[in-house]
């Protein structure tokens, strides 16, 4: 059962979108869900991690990368960056170059034949960044859409986190839908559900945080 008031969410999203319109930016502002937790000890309690597919793409310009020759050709046809094994070999496990690669993309996809070689080719860099490639196990275009729609919640050492769940170019209804999907999934990951939620805010990239819970 959600504890978010529909009226509060509607007013908050409207205020966020209006705020973004009054000061248009040269880039598409994302809408971040900011979460504060309570009654959780990251040292003792299990650190949760989970991904959920949202109904609408939160970041249309999200950068995804894919690999192997066949998939590289498919990727090029749908406007997705791609690199083959030979390109990865050129990085020569250089930590700085692998880190730069991880920072340049939101997510990575790889063919089975390539995934097996990644630890040997790149070392642990992508894994440390939480961006180890997902295997391409169906139509690449579908997988790219799934990846662009998916968000991940992961508790680390502190009881707060922020996740991009929408962008200001979406309709207010789409933004609200994505926010509620994200919140309901997050609550399902928590040990005591809503009892672990201290506060929730939404914020556009350049806007002020707006409390919704």
UniProtKB/Swiss-Prot annotation:
Lineage, opening ranks: Eukaryota, Viridiplantae, Chlorophyta, core chlorophytes, Chlorophyceae
Matches recorded under Gene3D superfamilies: 3.30.190.20
A Pfam entry, by short name: Ribosomal_L1
Gene Ontology CC terms: large ribosomal subunit
UniProt key word Amino-acid biosynthesis: no
Keyword terms, alphabetized: Ribonucleoprotein, Ribosomal protein
UniProt similarity note: Belongs to the universal ribosomal protein uL1 family.
GO process annotations (BP): translation
Protein name: Large ribosomal subunit protein uL1
Annotated gene: RPL10A
Entry's Gene Ontology molecular function annotations: RNA binding; structural constituent of ribosome
Protein's UniProt keywords contain Ribonucleoprotein: yes
InterPro entries: eL8/uL1-like, Ribosomal_uL1, Ribosomal_uL1-like, Ribosomal_uL1/biogenesis, Ribosomal_uL1_CS
